[in-house]
Regions:
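C-terminal beta-strand-rich structural cap/linker in extracellular carbohydrate-active enzymes
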Residues: 463-503, 568-594
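Short, flexible loop/turn segments at beta-strand junctions in immunoglobulin-like
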Residues: 471-473, 576-578, 649-654, 739, ...
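Active-site-proximal substrate-binding groove within the catalytic cores of carbohydrate-active enzymes
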Residues: 18-23, 33, 38-55, 86-89, ...
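Pro/Thr/Ser/Gly-rich low-complexity, intrinsically disordered linker/stalk tracts
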Residues: 595-625, 654, 672-683
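Gly-Asp-aromatic-enriched flexible segments
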Residues: 601, 606, 642, 676, ...
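Carbohydrate-recognition beta-sandwich/jelly-roll modules
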Residues: 1-121, 146, 233
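Aromatic- and carboxylate-enriched substrate-binding clefts and catalytic-loop regions
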Residues: 1-4, 8-16, 20-27, 121-348, ...
Length: 836
C-alpha cells in the first residue's frame, strides 16, 4: 500500500470551502497523501489534543467533539492496521444464496489476479447462518449454520482462504437472535411482560440485554468461537438499531443502567458490548460496524460503514460519492470510513465503473469489491488493479460539507521530493457531456506557473500550461488529471501501477546528469506480468530533450527485466516488463532535442450560448490547421487552456459587459498573433424557472436531482396533481443557486411527491434560505396533502438555498429517501431589472 506517514501527528486542515474559480464555493474536495503543504490550509489539527490552530492564531479546542459533534472522538489507532482493508465481500453478487464453493473460487481468483495488487481479505456476508435464504425467522440464529456450509464448516472455509495467503472475514448481526430456544435458555435477552420479546427489529426477533450478568459470556463466546476458527475481519451489522433500542428499552433490562437522555444511555450500553467483542477477537482483528453511520462506536471500531447499502448502476455511484464526501472528515482520523463496496461488472457502463473506481482510489477509503470476479472482462479487472490497494490518504477538509457531490476531487501527494496533484473531474450527469474549468488557483497552485497535464486513465499527455485547463468529460464518466509543476529539467509525471502514480510502487527517485544532459533514476516495485510505464514531462520551450538511453535491472534471483522507451513532443515514456514481482532499479539518460513548432492561427470567430444566469458555453469552429490548445481570456485575464472547440465559463455577473477572447497555442508556448474576440453581456430575464438554472451545489445522499421530474424519474405529482416544471429532491436535501441579487421574489408550490413508497407516515418541512438566513419555512407537510404555495421576497439575495428536512416520528427510524418537490418554482426579476 506504499509508505505510511507517522500517526498521530499534526496535519494541515481546511475549515471551509473556497471559490473554485468559476463561482462555485463548494465544488472541490481536497485530500492528502504524505506530508503535504498547501496554501489552501486554514491552519493545523493536532489529533491527540483534538485541537485546531488557525493560521491567524485562533485555537479551537475539542474540535471533533464539540465543533463536529463526535462525542467519543479519539485518534485512530493505526499501529496494527496502518491502512484500510482491501479485499472482496460476497454480499452484492450472492446475497443470501452464497455457498462455499463460490467463495473459494473467488478466493483463488483473488490470490492469482488481485492479491499481487494488494487485495488481502475475503469476507463472507449474510447467508451462512441459521437457514440462509430460507425463512426469515432463522436469519439471526448464530447457533447453527446453513446446510450449504455444514460439510466444509466455517473453520474449513477460513482455512481454505488462509491457505491462499489471504485473510478470512465474516458478517454477523450479533446483538440479535431469532432462535427462541436460544433466547430463552441464555437468559441474556430483553423480555416484555407476558413473556414476549421486548425488541423485534431487523437485528433479530430478540435483542440482547447489555446489562444481563451473562451477556458478556454469551456475546464474547460467539466472537471467540469465530476468532478460534481463524476469522480476523468482523463486520457487525445493524448497529444504529442497537443503539436506538438500548436507549429506548431500558425499562426491560435486568441490571442497572446509566443516567441520562435515551440516546446517551443507549450509546454507553452499546459501547459496553463493543468492549466485550473487542476482548474476544483481540486487537489484531479488524472490527467494522455497519448500518448507517454509528458514531457511538468511534474509538472502538477500526472502521465503519458510513451509509446505506449501495445498488448496482448509476444510482449506486451517486450513493457512493455522497457517502464518501459526506463522512470523509472522519476517515483516517477517527476511523477508516467504509462507503460500501465497489462494483464494476457489466452490464454497468465502462464509464460508470471508472467513476466508481476513481472515487475509491482517490480517497483511500476501505476498498472491498463485490462482483463474481471470475466473470469480469479484462477491462474491468484493469480498473481494479489500478486502485488496489487502499492507501494512507487523509482529508484536508475537516468540516461537514454542504455539497456531497463535488465534481472535483483533488488528491495532493508529497513523496520522494515529488509534489503533485491527482485530480478527478467527474460528470454526474449520465446523459450529457460536461465541460469544466480546472483552475490552478482553486487547487492552491501557482496560477502563473507551468504544470504538466496528464490524463491517467487514457494515458494522454496534454502539454504544460499556466492558469488552468478546460476538461471535457463524457456522460457519467470521469477524467483523472495529474498535475506536476514543470521545470527546466525532465520531471516524472506518472507511473502506471496505481492511481496515486508513484506512492504504491516508487521506492527511490533522483535527478542527475548535467543541465544539457540530465538524467533520472529510481527504484520501483514492479508486479510480474504487469507492464510498468514511467511517463516523464520534458521542459517546454524552443529547446528540450529526448531519451538517449534507458536501462533497468531486477533483484537478485528475479526474472529478467526488459525495458523499452519512446520520446514524443513534450514527454517521453519508459516501459519495464518482468515475469516476477520484484524491485527494479532503472535509469534514464536524456540528450538535447529541438521540438517541432507550427505557426498556429486562431479561430475566425467565437460564439456564446447562455447556460444559466452567469454561465455560458463558448464554442468556435474546429481549426483545419494544427494547434495544441486554445487559450481563453475573460476581461483581459487568462483563464485556462481548452483542448477542444468549446469552453464553459461561469461566475460572470449578469448585466455587465464582458470581453472574451480565444487564441490558438502551440506546445512550446508560442501563440497566434491575433485572437478571436467576443463581447458578452449576461442578461437577467423577467422570470426564470429554477429548473432552467444550474445549481451551485446539490446535497442529498441518494438519487440525482430531478429536473422537471420527480427524483426517481416519474412526473412531478403532489396531492394527485401533476406539474410540468420544477425540481424533484429527497426529503433530506439542500439545493443552492447563485442569483446575484437580481430577483425580487421566488414563487413556487411545495409538497411530498405522490411517489412516496413507504406505508409509514412521510412528513417533511420545506425551507427557503437566502445567504444562509431563513426567509420562509413551512409547517410539517405530509404525504398525500395538496401542494402548499410559496411566495418569498429574495431581493438582494446572492445565494438561494432550497432545503427539505424529514420529520421523524417517535419510535421510527429517520428516512431521508422520500421524494419531495419544488413545483413551478420560478424567480421573478427585481422591478429595476437587476439587483446589482
Amino acid at each position: 500500500a506504499g509508505p505510511v506517514t507517522p500517526w498521530p501527528r499534526t496535519v494541515p486542515v481546511r475549515l471551509e470551502p473556497r471559490d473554485d474559480g468559476g463561482g462555485a464555493r463548494d465544488d472541490i474536495m481536497i485530500t492528502t497523501l504524505g506530508e503535504v503543504r498547501t496554501s489552501l490550509a486554514d491552519g493545523s489539527f493536532d489529533p491527540e489534543a483534538d485541537r485546531v490552530t488557525t493560521s491567524d492564531g485562533r485555537v479551537l479546542d475539542h474540535y471533533y467533539r464539540d465543533s463536529l459533534g463526535i462525542t467519543y472522538y479519539k485518534p485512530l489507532d493505526k499501529s496494527i492496521f496502518p491502512v484500510p482493508p482491501s479485499g472482496w465481500c460476497t454480499w452484492y453478487y450472492y446475497y443470501r444464496v452464497v455457498n462455499p464453493a463460490e467463495v473459494i473460487a473467488n478466493a483463488h481468483w483473488i490470490a492469482e489476479n488481485l492479491a499481487p495488487f494488494g487485495a488481502r481479505y475475503v469476507q463472507l456476508d449474510d447467508g451462512w447462518q441459521g437457514m440462509g435464504e430460507r425463512g426469515a425467522g432463522a436469519w439471526r440464529d448464530w447457533s447453527t449454520i446453513d446446510t450449504r456450509f455444514q460439510e466444509i464448516g466455517l473453520g474449513g472455509l477460513a482455512d481454505s482462504i488462509r491457505s491462499l495467503g489471504l485473510e478470512a472475514g465474516i458478517w454477523i448481526a450479533p446483538h440479535g437472535q431469532s432462535n427462541t430456544q436460544v433466547a430463552r435458555s441464555s437468559k441474556v435477552f430483553l423480555w416484555a411482560p407476558g413473556d414476549s420479546s421486548a425488541s423485534t427489529t431487523w437485528e433479530g426477533r430478540y435483542l440482547m440485554d447489555p446489562t444481563a450478568p451473562a451477556a458478556p459470556a454469551y456475546l464474547g463466546g460467539i466472537f471467540k468461537q469465530l476468532r478460534d476458527l481463524d476469522f480476523t475481519y468482523f463486520k457487525i451489522d445493524g448497529q444504529t438499531i442497537v443503539v436506538h433500542e438500548y436507549g429506548d428499552k431500558t425499562k426491560y433490562m435486568h441490571g442497572p443502567v446509566p443516567q441520562g437522555e435515551p440516546r446517551e444511555v443507549g450509546a454507553e450500553l452499546y459501547r459496553k458490548t463493543l468492549r466485550t467483542i473487542r476482548g474476544a477477537i483481540g486487537d489484531s482483528s479488524y472490527l467494522l460496524a455497519s448500518w448507517g453511520t454509528p458514531l457511538e462506536g468511534v474509538g472502538l471500531y477500526n472502521g465503519s460503514r458510513t451509509g446505506g447499502d449501495i445498488v448496482q448502476g448509476w444510482d449506486g455511484v451517486l450513493g457512493a460519492v455522497s457517502t464518501v464526501q459526506r463522512w470523509n472528515f472522519l476517515h483516517n482520523i477517527a476511523w477508516y470510513s467504509d462507503p460500501d463496496v465497489l462494483i464494476v461488472r457489466p452490464p454497468m457502463r465502462e464509464g460508470t465503473a471508472r467513476v466508481w473506481s476513481t472515487i475509491m482510489g482517490l480517497t483511500g477509503q476501505a476498498l472491498m469489491s463485490s462482483d463474481r470476479l471470475i466473470d469480469l472482462p479484462d477491462s474491468r479487472v484493469e480498473l481494479l488493479r489500478r486502485v488496489y490497494p487502499a492507501t494512507d490518504i487523509r482529508p484536508l477538509d475537516l468540516y461537514r460539507p454542504t455539497n456531497t457531490r463535488k465534481p472535483i476531487m483533488d488528491l495532493k501527494v508529497s513523496h520522494l521530493g515529488r509534489d503533485y496533484d491527482v485530480v478527478g473531474v467527474f460528470n454526474y450527469d449520465p446523459d450529457n457531456s460536461s465541460n469544466r474549468l480546472l483552475s490552478w488557483s482553486a487547487l492552491g497552485l501557482d496560477s502563473t506557473a507551468l504544470y504538466h497535464v496528464y490524463d491517467f486513465w487514457n494515458g494522454t499527455y496534454y502539454g504544460s500550461w499556466e492558469h488552468g485547463i478546460f476538461i471535457d468529460v463524457p456522460p457519467g464518466d470521469v477524467r483523472v488529471i495529474t498535475l506536476v509543476r514543470a521545470t527546466e529539467r525532465p520531471e516524472l509525471i506518472s507511473t502506471s501501477r496505481h492511481i496515486t502514480q508513484g506512492w504504491v510502487d516508487l521506492r527511490a527517485l533522483s535527478h542527475g546528469g548535467s543541465a544539457t544532459k540530465p538524467s533520472l533514476s529510481g527504484e520501483s516495485r514492479v508486479i510480474g506480468g504487469d507492464p510498468y510505464t514511467l511517463t516523464v514531462g520534458l521542459p517546454r520551450g524552443k529547446s528540450s530533450f529526448r531519451i538517449a538511453t534507458a536501462r533497468a535491472s531486477g533483484s537478485a534471483g528475479g526474472a529478467p527485466v526488459r525495458v523499452s522507451w519512446t520520446s514524443h513532443q513534450g514527454y517521453a515514456t519508459v516501459t519495464i516488463r518482468t515475469d516476477s514481482t520484484q524491485v527494479v532499479r532503472w535509469g534514464i539518460d536524456f540528450e538535447p532535442a529541438a521540438p517541432y513548432v507550427y505557426p498556429v492561427t486562431s479561430p475566425q470567430r467565437i460564439e456564446a450560448t447562455a447556460t444559466g444566469l452567469s454561465n455560458f458555453m463558448l464554442h468556435w469552429p474546429v481549426e483545419y490547421y494544427p494547434r495544441s490548445a486554445y487559450q481563453v481570456e475573460v476581461d483581459g485575464r487568462p483563464v485556462g487552456e481548452a483542448f477542444g472547440a468549446r469552453a464553459s465559463v461561469a461566475g460572470l455577473a449578469p448585466g455587465k459587459e464582458h470581453r472574451i477572447s480565444v487564441r490558438s497555442m502551440w506546445a512550446d508556448g508560442s501563440a497566434a498573433e491575433k485572437a478571436a474576440e467576443l463581447t458578452w453581456t449576461p442578461t437577467v430575464p423577467d422570470s426564470v424557472y429554477i429548473s432552467e438554472l444550474e445549481p451551485l451545489s446539490v446535497q442529498q445522499d441518494w438519487e440525482q436531482l430531478g429536473v422537471n421530474r420527480a427524483v426517481r424519474g416519474s412526473a412531478l405529482s403532489v396531492g394527485g396533481k401533476e406539474y410540468a416544471k420544477g425540481i424533484g429532491t429527497l426529503s433530506e436535501s439542500q439545493v443552492s443557486y447563485r442569483i446575484f441579487g437580481s430577483f425580487a421574489r421566488l414563487e413556487a408550490s411545495v409538497g411530498l411527491d405522490d411517489g412516496v413508497r413507504r406505508r409509514s407516515p412521510a412528513q417533511a418541512i420545506f425551507e427557503v434560505r437566502g445567504d444562509g438566513k431563513t426567509l420562509w419555512r413551512s409547517d410539517t407537510l405530509s404525504r398525500g396533502s395538496a401542494a402548499v404555495p410559496v411566495s418569498v421576497d429574495v431581493s438582494g439575495v446572492d445565494e438561494l438555498t432550497l432545503v427539505v428536512t424529514p420529520v421523524v416520528q417517535p419510535n421510527t427510524d429517520r428516512d431521508d429517501s422520500d421524494p419531495a418537490d419544488w413545483l413551478d418554482a420560478r424567480l421573478i426579476a427585481s422591478p429595476t431589472g437587476s439587483g446589482l
